[in-house]
Amino acid sequence: ACGPGTAGLREGTGSDWQPIAVRATPADGAIVASSRSHGDRAKIEELLAGMNIRDHVTAGSSLKFCLLAEGAADVYPRYGPTSEWDTAAGHAVLTGAGGSVRKFDETELEYGKAGWRNPEFIARGAQ
């Protein structure tokens, strides 16, 4: 089964393990996860115009999905090429924590495409 609460666990207090989960974007602004070496900063800024942005964090590979899934970041816009194998595991973890990955037209990012190339997308924690 996949869905909120199925992504994974993190250590809580004592020996308790807590499910990871996305967070509601804080009132003081969103944290944007972005790639260390890919993407177009100007396009990202344009896409996020009108959003209250508090900070940007950089991470490699699927770690950006994990930052959203654990509530350490709020949005991950992706410009530039990726392949399905670059995103599938992170997408599953984020979805399991309550987040989403959508193309810029707001339809769900799909898998099994000819050529296995992904379009540009935006991953989000809470909606």
Task: Go through each PLM region and give its residues.
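Oxyanion/phosphate-interacting regions
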Residues: 25, 46-50, 65-127
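Acidic beta-strand-loop-alpha-helix segment within the catalytic core
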Residues: 1-65, 118-127
